[in-house]
């Protein structure tokens, strides 16, 4: 039994050894396959990482290409030994308030515009700049005087002595009417001057009207007239109203001529309005300041007609003219003159050049028939006798 037992154990050992010898090469092959698989996996991962890294690098390079910086960035600190650059000088005008200067400029411009607008509004409101119609050669401008004081002066270049006087007419309203043709450049600009008709024109109009019931004065060209008017209760009466019409040229070419009015009449009436609200119960006072002393002497009979004229003058329409001059040779006299009656209405209508011949003919006929007065110089200057004045005027008899 003992011999049989070892034999069985030996047999089992041999079988085990043979089995181990057969198992070892297979396991080695399997280990090799696993190692190769692991290595290939790592190699694949590394390849993928390399591809991703290359892609990122290319993408960043394209980005930098698109974002090119125009200047070179300084990465190195500047040396302290180098001199510093000089600072820029400050502009002192930057401190000034620019808005205030602009406002100042705008204010100056606005002031200019305001003055221009005031002139334009003044010209537009005035009746001088109203366009006249084509058919009307004359344009009348009426100035109604109510409760105001007007200083009216006739100016001339001649420097001569003057005398003062007061006349008291009973008229309460005065309408001064002037044609547009006779208006001068100064009247178109300032509207302060009104042309007064000359003595010859008034004489022609008086001869044409042939009204013996009117007493009118012919103003010389070298007189200074001052009107002082205050409101009266009876000013609304149409009968107590005096109107003056200034005749002008017929053709409309005189408007373009600036000196047309001065050739027709050199007398300008300056009217300056002053409010008089406190005084309302006075009458109109007219002061005539003449350059020389004139006395109304009849042309035919100096003694008879003068006395008759002095008798016909009413007490309410007589003004005493007193001469006050510094010249010792000038004679002082009181001259009585008649003015418009309270019921008379003086009307001077403008006439044209076509009627000049008829006016002159009528004037000659009326001068021969009626007893007109002539102004004769009575003052004796330098030992001379009484001579007739240079501007002999005609006054129609009442």
From Swiss-Prot:
GO biological process annotation, one example: intracellular signal transduction
GO cellular component: cytosol; Golgi apparatus; membrane; plasma membrane
Tissue expression per record: Expressed in spleen, thymus, and peripheral blood leukocytes. Expressed in several B-, T-, NK and monocyte cell lines.
Basic and acidic residues bias spans: 320-329
InterPro entries in alphabetical order: LAX (IPR031393)
Residue ranges that the UniProt entry lists as topological domain Cytoplasmic: 59-398
Job description of the protein: Negatively regulates TCR (T-cell antigen receptor)-mediated signaling in T-cells and BCR (B-cell antigen receptor)-mediated signaling in B-cells.
Protein name: Lymphocyte transmembrane adapter 1
